[in-house]
């Protein structure tokens, strides 16, 4: 049996002793530093004990608490939809009425935030996309939202109970946490497989019929309730005749019978401007089948299937030494290493989601709600950025706390660490190259523009730098439905090309996005900022245990201010310091992405369409010619758009104005820390000097980082 019964008795005594988890903090405060350390270490389970089983149980228990908080938060969202929103009004006229789910009380004049959202209601216009997802899932009344909110609270209570139960009553043993094959099978088949299958089932039996009727203009109050569709097959058969045949076509392999509600059309629904919900139901069913198969691939009690340890240990090539040997032990004993990998993958996936939300808008009427589109893109980019920086943070914690050099000899990890100087100096060169060349193209354009020589600028109308590879990818995908997917009526996304335009309620939902010289230029800025972020984060991980500047870093821990008073040049050199220096560049990278997205969409996609079919874009298609100079970015995007936000203070949009101001305050605050990163720069310089020595081109005069005082002088200037 893999659980231990009644390991820890339930008591509230410890709650009365702040800092009970630490010998030093439990004594109580001497200075104000105590409260900071209390917050820093309360959830750092690795510092409370060295017992991996106990740490694992605490993390496992915390996950249930986290789920409870998420469910309570979601319940609040649904409750607002049920109690304070105009959802039913929006549902009846989604092209004219704006979504609102919060009405501000008249306290100290805050009621200015309540704008006219149409349909006779006033409130804050929301940009979370919840109304659109509710419609897609078949919610037709505020009562249904209310019931869902109550359901979420019940689930939250269950999660809190589970957290208590699996720590105090039946706690899993370490072996259970380390049984990776069983975990993979259950997560793949259970969470992803059955999860997707149940969502596909909900879509087919509830969402599709309700949305079909809504699209046809049926009054939401006339539509049968969800449980009626589930219990009464005749209702579904009226909309999809093949429902009358039940499961016979499934078992007789006559699957094409189901093609009424499991489609492969591509493109967007012209009524709602969202993906065809019959396509998404088909997609989730297919995903479910794939993951149910994947959940049977790993070897557990029966002697068949994959063993991860075997896979990793036999995975070696001619140039990689011991290959992946030793990684299995790392990933089953260091949860930081495990978390780092998961954060890196989930962060990348979140950014992929950001780009799919606008190019393949999944919910009805999402594509014509431009504020929501912008918010969802921004949200997913930020979340992805945070997760990726978090990956580097936990990789560095793994290096400091969990890495044992004696067990890792000549495997991939060891080999990467041994040639870290080459990695960092090459990456540094790539950053310098990208920075000078990408900005150089802009500076050239600014100069030529100032000298009145437009024919010498890099632009679509002068010296062209067309993104030919991106255009080739677009073209291939635009042509795909005719060849690789003969039954599809349109390509996966209208953005690829092919001339299709979908407009809903006189607004453009989506159209082919042209790429030109302006995009080529800004994409190289993206490449530059991403590489700088990677340089900082990777340097933090590779030099987390030691460097030429501080050979004994591993003994100082993950975060330390300076290596003692006698070594002033060693400040801001810990692995933790690299995290916030990396965050700064992540913010820079993400800002350029969001600027690019919002201007490009307003210039080339979003806008209104006349009865004659003439499209008028919000900023009139000025991206291609304006964004090719720094001056154009400053004047036609930053100033042109910020001035509206800055002047919003007397209107219902003032909250956005304040958030805009606050976000810039946060960014400016982060600048302050950059200018004193003395040790960080010295450490980087020593890697680069190593590269020069190796090529025998090292200068006689030693390069040295600015002192903290010099750095601050530069910062002030």
Curated annotation (Swiss-Prot):
InterPro entries: PSI_PsaA, PSI_PsaA/B, PSI_PsaA/B_CS, PSI_PsaA/B_sf
Enzyme nomenclature, EC number: 1.97.1.12
Principal subcellular localization: plastid
Gene3D superfamilies: Photosystem I PsaA/PsaB
Residues binding chlorophyll a', per UniProt: 664
Tree of life domain: Eukaryota
Enzyme type, top EC level: oxidoreductase
Lineage of the species this protein comes from: Eukaryota, Viridiplantae, Streptophyta, Embryophyta, Tracheophyta
GO biological process: photosynthesis
Protein name as it appears in the record: Photosystem I P700 chlorophyll a apoprotein A1
A Pfam family that the UniProt record links to this protein: PsaA_PsaB
Family, per entry: Belongs to the PsaA/PsaB family.
Binding site for chlorophyll a: 672, 680
Membrane topology recorded in Swiss-Prot or TrEMBL: Multi-pass membrane protein
Positions of transmembrane segments: 59-82, 145-168, 184-208, 280-298, 335-358, 374-400, 422-444, 520-538, 578-599, 653-675, 713-717
Subunit composition and interactions: The PsaA/B heterodimer binds the P700 chlorophyll special pair and subsequent electron acceptors. PSI consists of a core antenna complex that captures photons, and an electron transfer chain that converts photonic excitation into a charge separation. The eukaryotic PSI reaction center is composed of at least 11 subunits.
Gene label: psaA
